[in-house]
Structure formats: structure tokens, C-alpha cells
Amino acid sequence: MDSIQQDRLSSLPDILLIMIISFLPLKECVRTSVLSKRWRYLCLETTNLSFKESDYVNPDITDAEYSRIVAYRSFFCSVDKWVSITQHQVVESFEICFSHLVGFEDKIDALIEYAVSTRVKNLVVDLSNPSWRSNGDISYRHFMYTLPKSVYSLTTLESLKIYGCKFDPSKFVNPVLLRSLSIGWVRLENLHSLLSKSPSLQSLSIKNCWGVDITSMAGQFRELVIEHSDFSYMQCAFELPRIHSFKYSGELFEFYFDVVNVIIPNVYLDFGEERVYDLQSQSSRISGEVISRIINDLRAAETLTVCPYILQVIPECEKPSDLLQPMETRHLVLRTKMHTKEFNGIILLLNNCPNLETLGFDILTPCPFSATSSDEGIDPKTYWMQKRTCKSLRKTLKVVVIRNFCGSSNELNVLRYLIRSASGAGDALERVELYVPNGMEESQAMVVFAKAEMLQRTSKHVQVLCAQLLKK
């Protein structure tokens, strides 16, 4: 930090400086104590406490049992020291992230009791293991910590995140201020009881849970996220009149939206956990009908993101063009492998988005293969050369974006079709953005950029831009 910046900060009162450093990670907050005498003790008054195993324990030593135990003890020694010197400070946010619980249950208990005693507004208890990838990674061999009873009576909570920790939602006494709830890596029963007591809840996230025993959900949620979770029942009805963002990832699960907004800003659907199949069957036709009905319920989505499985199955139902209703979608994102099995689904969605302004393709494989043989009557060489009229392509589509663009023949054929279909009638299409994946060899990237230049030369009224995809 240079002298000018220090002078500017020095002119601020302590209360503002404390507010500023409270937004920093705890380790960065502590480092401010060396700036000057005035800063020496300000970090002790931070209102946000976050103790993460990853900030203190070197992952390279986790293979050695003795070294690992020593590192964990050192972690809790540092945490205990910090808590002891800030006993009477105001704490608004408290976070503990620790994955190796055996032998340290009392330490976790003490930290959570400390957080409760400060009447925190935001509490994070994340005891999940970073190595877990699915619910199958958790077995009887994994110790599951039980949340202390004192948390249930904490009425100041506005945000609560519980991962890898046993708890009973029905035991919460009066969570009237709770606005954000995130639950993961746990058997989730009696959730309805907690939701019914939380009139202020606006954001709900359920990730990698099992035994979720709800058949209906109602509330004033603005955001609902459900990822890779197993429900006890086959159906669930949602009555969410104020929903702004809905994200579902996991196995095909039949859910209904009874009441929704006139416009839903964002909907994300990913049924990628369903089995890949080669031939159309009665099962795939039924799946297509279920997904089409779900999309119809969410047809007010302003931005809609779909997965390859959706693109493959929705054309397989009986009379798919009659089953799927016109949507209000203005921004459509297709997560695709650019396989011929997905082509009919792409056309079907384009035909049902008459107001489409932005069309995105997220290529899931770094370099999608180029199919050269026909697949169920679909020839990738000629499919996009056929006359297929989509109203939105001629009148409203302005921008096409492809991420992880590798210049495959399937990608180029789709682009040529879109540009050709958009020509004339006002030339609504203005720009095509192509993003080459990171890590591509320079020689291969040069070929991809050359293909983009060729596309530009054949597209008079459309600007074609090609760039490297930035790392997230």
C-alpha cells in the first residue's frame, strides 16, 4: 500500500476502517495490523470471523497421519487464541469449515456455542469433505457431526449454511429473520417445518442431500437451487409467485410450478445425471414429455439454460411441436456436445422462442467430435443446409455466442445456418462471438481463428469476433 492510499485511509474514522477490513478474509484482515500503530489492534474488532481448514492446513501433508493431526491441533490453537481475545466483540458473521471431525468434536461445539453467544446474523457450519463428489462418497464410515441444540433457538439468524452436519429443521424455534438458507451433504427431513416458520426466506439452496421428504414447496423465494439431491417422492409442486432464479441439476424429477411470476429472469435445467442412451425408447419418450411439461411451466423464463439430455429427448415425444408451447425466452443457452442427436432439439427450442435475442452454445467437451455418418436419419453434412424457418432468427435474434469453440464441422454448419436464416428481413443478427477454450495448442488455435476469419468473409452483414476464453 503506497503512502497516498495510506493517507486517504488515515483520514477515515476507526468505525469505517473496521467496516472495510471486515470484508477481507481473516488472514488478510490480520495483515493490516502491521500497517501502522493505529492499525495494530483494529483487526481484533472485525465483525466477520471465518476459520477455514484450507487457510491453515497445507493439503500436501494430509497423507501423513501424525503430521495431519499436528496441523489440525495447530489450526484449533490459532482459532482458540483469536476467539479468546475477541470474546466481547460484536460478531455479525461466523464461519467454520473443517472436514476431519474425529477427535475435534468438542472444539467444533465450543466454536458454535461462541457464535451463538454473540447472536450472529450469518452462520456457516461447513463440515463436508472436499473429496466428496457425490452422495455415494458418504458411507457409515464417515462420522457425521450433530448440530448443537443452541443453534435452534438463535432468533437473530438472517443467513444459515449447514454442510455435512446432522440437524433437525423442525427444531428451529422462531427463524423469522432468516433470509438465506443453504443445506448440503446431509439427510434432509422435516424441511417443510422450517420453511413454514420462515416468512422472510428469499434464497434456498439444497445441494447433495438425500431423503428430501417434501412433496410441495411454497413461499416468497426469489432464488431456489437444487443440485444432485435425492427426493423421497417422485413429484413436487412449487408455488413460488416471486421466483427470480430457479436452478435444478440432477436426475429427472417431476416437479410442477403452480404459480410463477409473469417473467422469471433465470432458469437453469440440467438432467445430465440421466443415463446416456443410443436408441429411442418408451422411456425416453416419457422423459421427453415430462421435460416438455416442465419447460411449459417455466415458459416465462427470460433466460433459459438447458443440457444435452433435454435437447435429445424433447423431440422424441409424440407430436413434440404441439406439446411444447411458445416461450417468453429472450436469452437461450444450449449446453451441448454438438451431437447429431441434439439437432432436432435445438430446432424445436428455436421454433418455440419467437422473441429470442441472444443464443448461446456452451460446448461441453473441449473439442467436440465431428460426426460424419448419419444418426437416426440425421446427416450432419446436410441437416443444416435444409430450409428450416424459425421466426426469431429472422426478426429478433441479435447475438450468437459459442463458448469452447473448436471450429468443428458441426459448429460451423450451425453457424452458417443461423447467419443464413437471419439474412434479409431487416438483418436482425448483428454479431457472432466465438470463444476458443483455454489450453488449446497455439497451432490448433491458429486454425480455429482462420476458420472464424473465413466465416466473417462469407457473412456480409454480421460481425464475427473470435477470442480466447478467459479463465474463471
Curated annotation (Swiss-Prot):
Pfam families: F-box, LRR_At1g61320_AtMIF1. InterPro entries: F-box-like_dom_sf, F-box_AtFBL13-like, F-box_dom, FBL60-like, LRR_At1g61320_AtMIF1, LRR_dom_sf. It comes from the Eukaryota. Residues 6-54 form the F-box domain. Keywords: Leucine-rich repeat, Repeat. LRR repeats lie at residues 58-87, 135-164, 183-208, 225-250, 283-308, 338-363. This is Putative F-box/LRR-repeat protein At5g54820. It comes from Arabidopsis thaliana (Mouse-ear cress). The lineage of its organism: Eukaryota, Viridiplantae, Streptophyta, Embryophyta, Tracheophyta.
